[in-house]
């Protein structure tokens, strides 16, 4: 049979999950207008980030997410061997990201969150409802990676200083900001006819109403966190991003956060996680487990 007559092979499960994870990162970056975050309108509160860099970073992580899904197929169960494989792949993915961005941290938190969720989905693709996937991800996150020394990241310092739940704890508790806030708001706004982009903005704002965003705390302390949470709630109370009053409140929140140099990067990572989970069941369909 000639090459022209060959039937294309269907994408493997690992490839579909990697596609979905990268799509979630790109969709989060493109969503506009987000308060003080990189989007199609501006670079937000960042001087070292722009939309093209976010896209390049997301695309560079596709092999990492695929290998994580492959690891789930190899080990087939939550446990230390799979957890340590994920840790190694995550560190390698972070190194790839930093090479791509010339040292700028674009998606470190997203590698953690989406890496866990990709792996959790790959462990049981027949049971990919939000609660099930997040609970499997939590079980993985609770296992200590023995190859990692004590962390001194900005996020870990903020967690120690303020006693809040950081990215690690968010995962270990099954992503409550996604399950309890983002996904329900996404569904409510869709049902209200807000349009997909506004529904996603509302989901981001729902996360921001309760999240102790360590990126905001690092940059602007408790004042910044309170500004973020209260401002996001005002947008939703005004009718959400689809309403005129909500858009005015959203613009005001953007200006307030920019004045504080506070960018809700933790909320952005969790929105990407929300979009990944939201797209799981529609995207998987019949899959091949072959690599």
From Swiss-Prot:
* A GO BP entry: prosthetic group biosynthetic process
Which pairs of positions does the record mark as disulfide bonds?
A: none
From the UniProt record, list the reaction(s) this protein catalyses.
3'-dephospho-CoA + ATP = 2'-(5''-triphospho-alpha-D-ribosyl)-3'-dephospho-CoA + adenine
Q: Which Pfam families match?
A: CitG
Gene3D superfamilies found in the cross-reference section: Triphosphoribosyl-dephospho-CoA protein
* GO MF annotation terms: ATP binding; triphosphoribosyl-dephospho-CoA synthase activity
Report the sequence similarity comment from the record: Belongs to the CitG/MdcB family.
This molecule's function is given as:
Involved in the formation of 2-(5''-phosphoribosyl)-3'-dephosphocoenzyme-A, the prosthetic group of the acyl-carrier protein of the malonate decarboxylase.
Q: Could you tell me what this protein is called?
A: Probable 2-(5''-triphosphoribosyl)-3'-dephosphocoenzyme-A synthase
Q: Which organism is it from?
A: Pseudomonas syringae pv. tomato (strain ATCC BAA-871 / DC3000)
